[in-house]
């Protein structure tokens, strides 16, 4: 069953619960122990909803692409071939990617963009994210920033549920801006702590000028 029988909608809480159940089942039931072999069948050459893309400023052959359903993918071949990032980000809704002045990579999660009918009723609910992830080793590994993890993964109005856009200061290695569902936030310590540049309200974009 995909829809809530009472509302007729796919509820975020149901989706997250199913996601956790699948993860638990996969951990307990490895296909290798069942003697099963899997082969990818496609689809081929069909792009998903790619919300974010970044070309490494220190290595133009290296690119990052974020999907709202498939996580983060990395290319070292100018985009001709792609591999998924490490497993901590599989199936996360990637919404934004930015690179700090010193080359660190920040990835924002959670898709706040939704569809609605003429009466304002949402029929494609947003996908709650897991905050912001950071890489300090050129994308080899990513770690979650604890200060950005939503305190309730079943509550779409909670702070850090949706990080729609990230932007880095061009001169300050540790200064990052985040447009979120709960205000425009800023860190000056590389994501350890955040303060409100503008508190409250939903922000979906942020830009930093060339002069900072």
Where are these regions (language model features)?
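Extracellular glycan-interacting surfaces
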Residues: 1-212
């Amino acid at each position: 069953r995909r829809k809530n029988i009472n509302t007729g909608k796919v509820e975020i809480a149901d989706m997250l619960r199913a996601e956790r159940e699948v993860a638990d089942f996969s951990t307990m039931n490895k296909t290798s122990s069942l003697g099963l072999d899997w082969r990818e069948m496609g689809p081929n050459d069909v792009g998903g909803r790619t919300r974010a893309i970044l070309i490494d400023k220190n290595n133009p052959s290296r690119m990052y692409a974020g999907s709202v359903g498939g996580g983060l993918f990395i290319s070292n071949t100018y985009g001709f071939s792609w591999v998924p990032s490490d497993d901590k980000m599989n199936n996360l809704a990637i919404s934004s990617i930015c690179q700090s002045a010193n080359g660190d990579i920040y990835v924002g999660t959670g898709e706040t963009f939704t569809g609605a009918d003429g009466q304002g009723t949402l029929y494609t609910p947003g996908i709650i994210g897991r905050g912001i992830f950071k890489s300090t080793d050129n994308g080899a590994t990513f770690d979650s920033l604890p200060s950005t993890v939503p305190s309730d993964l079943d509550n779409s109005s909670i702070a850090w549920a949706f990080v729609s856009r990230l932007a880095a200061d061009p001169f300050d290695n540790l200064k990052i801006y985040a447009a979120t569902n709960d205000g425009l936030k800023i860190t000056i310590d590389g994501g350890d702590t955040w303060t409100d540049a503008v508190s409250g309200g939903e922000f979906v974009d942020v830009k930093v000028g060339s002069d900072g």
